[in-house]
Swiss-Prot record:
A Pfam family it matches: Ribosomal_L35p
InterPro entries linked to this entry: Ribosomal_bL35 (IPR001706), Ribosomal_bL35-like (IPR021137), Ribosomal_bL35_CS (IPR018265), Ribosomal_bL35_sf (IPR037229)
Organism whose genome encodes this protein: Rickettsia canadensis (strain McKiel)
Keywords: Ribonucleoprotein, Ribosomal protein
Family: Belongs to the bacterial ribosomal protein bL35 family.
Protein name, per record: Large ribosomal subunit protein bL35
GO CC annotation terms, alphabetical: cytosolic large ribosomal subunit
Keyword Cell inner membrane tagged: no
GO terms classed as biological process: translation
GO-annotated molecular function: structural constituent of ribosome
Ribonucleoprotein as UniProt keyword: yes
Gene responsible for this protein: rpmI
Length: 68
């Protein structure tokens, strides 16, 4: 069976932790920022851990060899 390719877009957007969780950056920071409060903008900084089902789907379909 041939090797599976990792999706390049997923490599750029997601990272795996040592325990196998999937980390992604917060959504909703690209435009329309003027209608958000300063606290909302601050809270959108950084990363978040995806829920179990989303993380499972990312690892299964987009990062086939990232199954720590």
């Amino acid at each position: 069976m041939p090797k599976l390719k990792t999706k390049s877009a997923a490599k750029k957007r997601f990272k795996l932790t040592a325990s196998g969780n999937v980390i992604a950056s917060q959504a909703g920071k690209k435009h329309f920022m003027r209608r958000r409060t300063k606290a909302q903008i601050r809270n959108l900084r950084g990363t978040t851990i995806l829920c179990n089902q989303e993380g499972y789907n990312i690892k299964k379909y987009f990062l086939p060899y990232g199954t720590n």
